[in-house]
Structures are given as C-alpha cells and as structure tokens.
C-alpha cells in the first residue's frame, strides 16, 4: 500500500483530498491538528507517533523529524541498497508528502506580534519534509498548495512525471520565499550581505514595453497597502506593462502632496500637476498645464472623484484614472468607456516611509534609498541680491518637489499650484530649459513663473535663456565650479536665485 504524509496548517480542501488519496490506495499518516481533522471526518488515518514509535515533543516542534519518516521519503526506489536499508529498519516508503507551512507572514503582519510569537511560526519540520519529497520527485509527490489538490489526484491516475517535477520546483520556490521572509524579519537591514527578495506572480502581461517582449507582473508577499500592487481595479482593460510603470510613477508623485492634487503622467514623466482647493480645481490646473500631452495619460488624484471632475475627464481619452474612491455618479460616467482603467488607491504614506528601490542591470542589481528628500525653508540659501517673494518661495517649493520626479536633465517651470512646462531627459541642461520654457509660454498663467533644476547649472546659458523668457525666480542645487557665473547673470537680470545643496538626478 502506498503511503501519504499529511500535515497542513491550511485545512482548505483537506478532507476531499484525503478521500481521493484513499480511493487511490493510499494509507494516510498525519500529525496533530491534521490528524484530528481527518479523524473527525471519519477518515482512517495513522498518527506519526504510531509510525515512528516516538511521541511529538517540545510543544510540537518535533513531529516528523525522524528517520522513519525522512528515510521513507528520501529512499531512491531504483536503488536496491536504499530499498534494502528500508526493509532492514522496517521503514515503509512515503510516496506523497502534503504539507503547507506555518503562517509566518500572516503572523508578523500583526502590529502587536511579539518576537517569541513570530519565532514559533517558523516552520522546521514542514520545509524539511517538503524539500525531501521534492528532492526525490522522481518517485515522490511533493504537495504544498491546496490549489493543486485536484491536479495531483488526476496526476496520480496518469502517473504524471512532468507534474511531479513541476510541483517539486514549486516547493523549492515556496520554501525559498518562506526563508526570505524570515531573513527579512530577523534582520531588516536595507543593504544586507545577501539580498533575498521574494515575489509572487500576480499576472502574465500581454507583452512588455514593446509587443515583441514577454512580461509578467510580480508582487511582494505582503504589498504595502499604499503601493500600486495593493491597488484595486474596478473597471477597464487589464493593466499593461507600461501602464504599471506609469501608474507607479504617478502614485509616487501624488504622495508628495497633502492638499487636493492631480498628477498626469506620460512615459513616467509628469506632463501636468495641479493643486486646488477642490479636486475639480486641481484637475483644471493639471489639464491646463499641458492639454496636448495629457491625452492618453495616467491620472492620479488624492481625493475621491466627484461627478463634476468625472464629467471633465470623461471628455478625454485616458489610460488610467486612480483615486481613493469614486462617487457613484462619477463612476457611472467614467465607466461608460469600457477600456479606461479605474483603480482605487491608498495615498496615506508619505515619501519618507517608502524605503528602498531596486534597478536590475545585466548580471546584477542596484539598491538605493528612495529619493525621499524634501527641502524645507531652512535648507534654502538665497544667493542673489534680489530675494524671492513669499509667493515665489511657494512656487519654487512646488517646482522643486516636482523636478525630482522628472527624468534628468530635468527642468520644471511652474506657479505655486501648477506646472507650466517640463523639460525632461535631455542630454544637456539647456535643451531641457528650452523645452520647458517653450511649453510654459503657451500657458495663460505664465506671468511670474519660476523655474527649478534637478542639478546645478554648468554654465550661465540656462539663466540667460530663462531671463529672456521672463522667469522671475530660480531654484537649483548649486555646487558648480561656475556657480558664480550663473549668480552674476541672475543679478544682472534681477532674478531671485535660491540654492538647496541637494541634487535630484533621476535616471
């Protein structure tokens, strides 16, 4: 008779799976709570103690860790010496191991969890039995996920070796992820000696950045509730690879603002950001910032969408609209377009709470702290004769907040509540200045605009160009060996200039 070892913390589907195994000629061996569950259902089951001749001990820490279990799992059926050793020690082979692991991740999510409670949820016997079965998957079934029970029963009928190998790989993936979560809990160092992240596939994507590239979306085991991975899609087509990247960028920008704000993004750069007393007012500012580029854009709002705002957005082709909520009548209007993706998001986090970010390179990975720096008035140094007005300081602070989210070389022209022109990704800074000002001057709200730069001005040509296009104040990090030239040029034109001492490159 074949033997199956069952020891599960998640009892989903257990009884029907056990009955299926019995129907296929298996003897069931089980531990603790699993044994009680099966016995209560009237299923014949043998306890592990009866097999090993040794009781469970240490409050259940030692149950299946015994040669009569592990030898039965690990013995190679095609090796006469292995089978003879089993016979000599009166050990029966174990042909299927069904184990799922203690809920460590769920335990550490509890805000009041103690270290002792977390440690008790580190499974030892479960991973050991599963890994043993997976190692010997030429003969032994390793089952870790209740979602696989039906497939396993069918696979047993067909002696499906391919499925057995696939499930073995799944075991090693899940136990590796499980161990990674334990590592991170015990040592949450952001730059550890060994970096062991773990992600689970959320979905296969139609394609990647371009149609000839394959892609999939993976998420952390327990995504931050304010992350895009935790957003809920209410309506529209499936998110694409580019949608996900753009939406994440939009959400990062949105976190910067506490007042009603609307962020519009194209190709991971902002094309319009507006602030207002109401979310409708913020939308009006964001739209007016660049009515052309917003077409086909990703929109993020930090207040619920009301009917008036929805009716305005509905007039445009937009890829995504994200907000904390949608009023019922607003949702009804927006959902008339079957393809627009409507997502609810949580915007509670501030940028300072977001930890690290990673960038893959060929053969490696870069990890850095996110650019959470936000300059305060105390960080600013006025370096020109002319000092900025209070209103200009507000506009400079807003432009400075936006510019760190723009691809370098980055220039932002703005008022205190609205971007007017954005120059992104140019290989020389004057090119970004020209782009930003060309766009900004088309805006009816241009008079009195200010300019922000993500890095210092290597020459005074940027200030010269800004002055000729009526910029009244500039904020930049400073630090160039030619700072003096730019400052003198600003003084010549009567422009107020403020330095921060902080660069905000974005690649």
UniProtKB/Swiss-Prot annotation:
Annotated GO MF terms: IMP cyclohydrolase activity; phosphoribosylaminoimidazolecarboxamide formyltransferase activity
PROSITE patterns hit by this protein: MGS
Organism: Lacticaseibacillus paracasei (strain ATCC 334 / BCRC 17002 / CCUG 31169 / CIP 107868 / KCTC 3260 / NRRL B-441) (Lactobacillus paracasei)
Covalent S-S links between cysteines: none
Domain MGS-like: 1-144
Catalytically driven reaction(s): (6R)-10-formyltetrahydrofolate + 5-amino-1-(5-phospho-beta-D-ribosyl)imidazole-4-carboxamide = 5-formamido-1-(5-phospho-D-ribosyl)imidazole-4-carboxamide + (6S)-5,6,7,8-tetrahydrofolate; IMP + H2O = 5-formamido-1-(5-phospho-D-ribosyl)imidazole-4-carboxamide
Matching InterPro entries: AICAR_Tfase_dup_dom_sf, Cytidine_deaminase-like, MGS-like_dom, MGS-like_dom_sf, PurH-like
Keyword field: Hydrolase, Multifunctional enzyme, Purine biosynthesis, Transferase
A Pfam family this chain is assigned to: AICARFT_IMPCHas
Protein name from the UniProt record: Bifunctional purine biosynthesis protein PurH
Enzyme nomenclature, EC number: 2.1.2.3, 3.5.4.10
CDD domains: IMPCH
Record field: transmembrane: none
Source species, domain of life: Bacteria
Annotated SUPFAM superfamilies: Cytidine deaminase-like (SSF53927), Methylglyoxal synthase-like (SSF52335)
Biological or metabolic pathway of the protein: Purine metabolism; IMP biosynthesis via de novo pathway; 5-formamido-1-(5-phospho-D-ribosyl)imidazole-4-carboxamide from 5-amino-1-(5-phospho-D-ribosyl)imidazole-4-carboxamide (10-formyl THF route): step 1/1; Purine metabolism; IMP biosynthesis via de novo pathway; IMP from 5-formamido-1-(5-phospho-D-ribosyl)imidazole-4-carboxamide: step 1/1
Cellular component, GO annotation: cytosol
HAMAP family hit by this protein: PurH
BP terms from Gene Ontology: 'de novo' IMP biosynthetic process
NCBIfam families linked: PRK00881.1, purH
Description of its domains: The IMP cyclohydrolase activity resides in the N-terminal region.
Family membership noted in the UniProt record: Belongs to the PurH family.
């Amino acid at each position: 008779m074949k033997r199956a070892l069952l020891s599960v913390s998640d009892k989903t589907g257990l009884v029907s799976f056990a009955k299926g195994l019995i129907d296929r000629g298996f003897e069931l061996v089980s531990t603790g709570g699993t044994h009680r569950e099966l016995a209560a259902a009237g299923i014949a089951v043998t306890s592990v103690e009866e097999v090993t001749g040794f009781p469970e001990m240490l409050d259940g820490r030692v149950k299946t860790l015994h040669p009569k279990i592990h030898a039965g799992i690990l013995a190679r059926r095609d090796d006469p010496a292995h089978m003879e050793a089993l016979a000599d020690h009166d050990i029966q082979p174990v042909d299927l191991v069904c184990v799922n692991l203690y809920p460590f991740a769920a335990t550490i999510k509890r805000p009041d969890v103690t270290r002792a409670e977390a440690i008790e949820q580190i499974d030892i016997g479960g991973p050991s039995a599963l890994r043993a079965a997976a190692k010997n998957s030429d003969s032994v079934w390793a089952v870790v996920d209740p979602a696989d029970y039906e497939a396993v029963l069918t696979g047993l009928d067909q002696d499906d070796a391919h499925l057995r190998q696939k499930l073995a790989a799944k075991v090693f993936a899940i136990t590796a992820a499980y161990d990674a979560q334990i590592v991170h809990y015990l040592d949450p160092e952001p730059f550890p000696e060994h970096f062991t992240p773990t992600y689970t596939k959320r979905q296969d994507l139609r394609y990647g950045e371009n149609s000839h590239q394959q892609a999939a979306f993976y998420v952390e085991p327990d995504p931050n509730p304010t992350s895009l991975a935790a957003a809920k899609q209410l309506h529209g087509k499936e998110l694409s690879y580019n949608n996900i990247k753009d939406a994440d960028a939009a959400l990062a920008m949105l976190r910067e603002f506490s007042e009603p704000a609307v962020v519009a993004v194209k190709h991971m750069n902002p094309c319009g950001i507006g602030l207002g007393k109401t979310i409708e007012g913020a939308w009006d500012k964001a739209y007016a910032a660049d009515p052309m580029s917003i077409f086909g854009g990703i929109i993020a709002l930090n207040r619920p969408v009301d009917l008036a705002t929805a009716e305005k957005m509905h007039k445009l082709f937009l890829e995504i609209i994200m907000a904390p909520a949608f009023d019922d009548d607003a949702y009804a209007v927006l959902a008339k377009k079957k393809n627009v993706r409507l997502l609810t998001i949580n915007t509670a986090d501030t940028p300072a709470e977001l930890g690290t970010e990673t960038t893959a390179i060929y053969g490696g990975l870069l990890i850095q702290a996110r650019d959470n720096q936000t300059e305060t008035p105390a960080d600013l140094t006025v370096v020109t004769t002319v000092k900025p007005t209070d209103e200009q300081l507000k506009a400079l602070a807003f432009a400075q907040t936006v510019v760190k989210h723009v691809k370098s070389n980055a220039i932002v022209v703005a008022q205190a509540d609205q971007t007017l022109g954005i120059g992104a990704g140019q290989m020389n800074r004057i090119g970004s200045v020209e782009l930003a000002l060309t766009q900004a001057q088309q805006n009816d709200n241009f008079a009195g605009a200010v300019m922000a730069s993500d890095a210092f001005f290597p020459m005074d040509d940027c200030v010269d160009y800004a002055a000729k296009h009526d910029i009244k104040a500039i904020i930049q990090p400073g630090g160039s060996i030619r700072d003096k030239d730019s400052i003198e040029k600003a003084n010549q034109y009567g422009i107020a200039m403020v330095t921060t001492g902080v660069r905000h490159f974005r690649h």
